[in-house]
Amino acid sequence: MNKPLTPSTYIRNLNVGILRKLSDFIDPQEGWKKLAVAIKKPSGDDRYNQFHIRRFEALLQTGKSPTCELLFDWGTTNCTVGDLVDLLVQIELFAPATLLLPDAVPQTVKSLPPREAATVAQTHGPCQEKDRTSVMPMPKLEHSCEPPDSSSPDNRSVESSDTRFHSFSFHELKSITNNFDEQPASAGGNRMGEGGFGVVYKGCVNNTIVAVKKLGAMVEISTEELKQQFDQEIKVMATCQHENLVELLGFSSDSDNLCLVYAYMPNGSLLDRLSCLDGTPPLSWHTRCKVAQGTANGIRFLHENHHIHRDIKSANILLDKDFTAKISDFGLARASARLAQTVMTSRIVGTTAYMAPEALRGEITPKSDIYSFGVVLLELITGLAAVDENREPQLLLDIKEEIEDEEKTIEDYTDEKMSDADPASVEAMYSAASQCLHEKKNRRPDIAKVQQLLQEMSA
């Protein structure tokens, strides 16, 4: 017979049945991420960093529960059920807290219907809601950025909105991509690459090469959420055009296979060019500086028009024939009424190796884009990937610690494949990256300041 659970019961002593029930509550909507970032060391520092969270996340691909693995690991520190329940209540996961210690959950929460209980803290703190697909009206700046029709509801679908994009049939897109040929484009086929939410194929429309992204449901992404991201991408691109944002040409939504059609970027992604994929030559330092400045221009345009990208990374920075940077993938973008506003979301999204500490807690703020851009600047300097499990340190952003501890210098990490790197400008870009990567969001510069730092670097 199992012993009753008490606040002093060790987490490591929970039986498999209880762990399975906990994972049923905590695994969905990535509640385990919220729990992981809430767990602290005795010193008050975070116990789990981005790399740890990536490892837990990878377990989903093998069919394992990240919640169970997280509790197995944390359980080695002699933490108790009481400790766990305190954190579950803190992050508003009341159902699993009640499962463990019913009396530990506030009576006001338990007495509410389930839907209200899940959102009880909204009356007292920041709103925690599912990502909406609305786009806030935005002022016109130097480049075209028109607000959506205010007479239409925010949650309208793209089929009923005036998007100004061409509507392709899925049959047309099959035709222009050779039936979505899976052979790599580098080998004469059509497949160009794979992203977080779909596969990109090369196509040809009226003698013009285009890129067709066929969206596909990934682990933990439902069909409904994929449709929301599809709608969001179109709405953002319909209202914002800028030389440093990728150009959306059209879409297809007449079948179960949602597709987006973009202008073709001959030089692929910054990630691929930094890794010299397919034997391409390394980017010069001059080109890297140009890419950094172009990306900063694009981020500034988004922020000044009240948009937070939420997934700035080298894979989402595309390069045209002149190596002009084009920010892509706006499916996770979020509209914010005020530039400095921080809101909360119940779903933590983005790429972990680039995510700011507050983003891992579910905060949505422009300063998280700044942090992610800091990682991109490190990639430009070093030519290294943001994360590599076979490297030490595994997270690229951790080189900042080594440099601050005077164990190494930025020269030790500068990409040796560059022949024109200027030590002074490399140091200046690293200084900008270091400021972007400050743990405290309010200590990071805004994007206008980052632009200034990058311009001074090239002066």
UniProtKB/Swiss-Prot annotation:
The modification Phosphoserine is found at S346. PROSITE patterns: PROTEIN_KINASE_DOM. Coiled coil: none annotated. Pfam families: Pkinase. The modification Phosphothreonine is found at T342, T345. Residues 186-454 form the Protein kinase domain. Its EC number is 2.7.11.1. GO terms for biological process: cytokine-mediated signaling pathway; innate immune response; interleukin-1-mediated signaling pathway; interleukin-33-mediated signaling pathway; JNK cascade; neutrophil mediated immunity; neutrophil migration; positive regulation of canonical NF-kappaB signal transduction. Signal peptide: none annotated. Disruption phenotype: Mice are strongly altered in their responses to viral and bacterial challenges due to a severe impairment of interleukin-1 and Toll-like receptor signaling pathways. Malt1 and Irak4 double knockout suggests an additional role of Irak4 in B-cell antigen receptor (BCR) mediated signaling pathway, since the double mutant inhibits B-cell proliferation. It catalyses: L-seryl-[protein] + ATP = O-phospho-L-seryl-[protein] + ADP + H(+); L-threonyl-[protein] + ATP = O-phospho-L-threonyl-[protein] + ADP + H(+). Phosphorylated. Residues 115-161 are annotated as: Disordered. ATP binds at residues 192-200, 213, 313-316, 329. Its cofactor is Mg(2+). Serine/threonine-protein kinase that plays a critical role in initiating innate immune response against foreign pathogens. Involved in Toll-like receptor (TLR) and IL-1R signaling pathways. Is rapidly recruited by MYD88 to the receptor-signaling complex upon TLR activation to form the Myddosome together with IRAK2. Phosphorylates initially IRAK1, thus stimulating the kinase activity and intensive autophosphorylation of IRAK1. Phosphorylates E3 ubiquitin ligases Pellino proteins (PELI1, PELI2 and PELI3) to promote pellino-mediated polyubiquitination of IRAK1. This is Interleukin-1 receptor-associated kinase 4.
